[in-house]
């Protein structure tokens, strides 16, 4: 079994996933648009080039997402996408990038369980936890 996060966006999925691919050193494996749907399916006006389904491979994890047209889009709440990073320097770098233009919920710092841990909500409204565990 595998559990994968699926993120929703109000029309910014392409920008968000392109950004995440760069920050997380991932590979975009799918980026399907609404205008690629079979004929006869309803596509909201102006949403043809918006993302119907995206997949980003990061290590052995797949993050999926799409643009969700109004009134169905809901701002993310009640969860965090958690990233485990091997080195404090890499954790700081990823946290800084995800925080740029967003809101820092908990600054990245040493905690009793981690060399580095921080929580931020990025400029796309996705909540992230960045963690670099203590060894030993």
What do the PLM-derived regions correspond to, one by one?
Residues 7-60:
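Core segments of cupin and vicinal oxygen chelate
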Residues 79:
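Short, acidic (Asp/Glu-rich) active-site segment that either coordinates a divalent metal cofactor
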Residues 3, 29-32, 43, 50, ...:
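Vicinal oxygen chelate
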């Amino acid at each position: 079994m595998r559990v994968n996060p699926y993120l929703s966006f109000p029309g910014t999925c392409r920008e968000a996933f392109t950004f995440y691919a760069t920050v997380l050193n991932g590979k975009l494996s799918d980026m399907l648009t609404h205008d690629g749907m079979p004929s006869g399916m309803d596509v909201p006006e102006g949403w043809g080039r918006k993302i119907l389904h995206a997949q980003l491979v990061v290590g052995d994890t797949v993050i999926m997402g799409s643009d969700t047209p109004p009134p169905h889009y809901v701002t993310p709440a009640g969860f965090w996408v958690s990233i485990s990073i091997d080195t404090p320097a890499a954790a700081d770098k990823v946290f800084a990038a995800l925080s740029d233009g967003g809101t820092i919920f908990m600054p990245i710092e040493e905690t009793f369980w981690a060399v580095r841990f921080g929580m931020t909500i990025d400029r796309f409204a996705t909540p992230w936890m960045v963690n670099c565990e203590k060894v030993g």
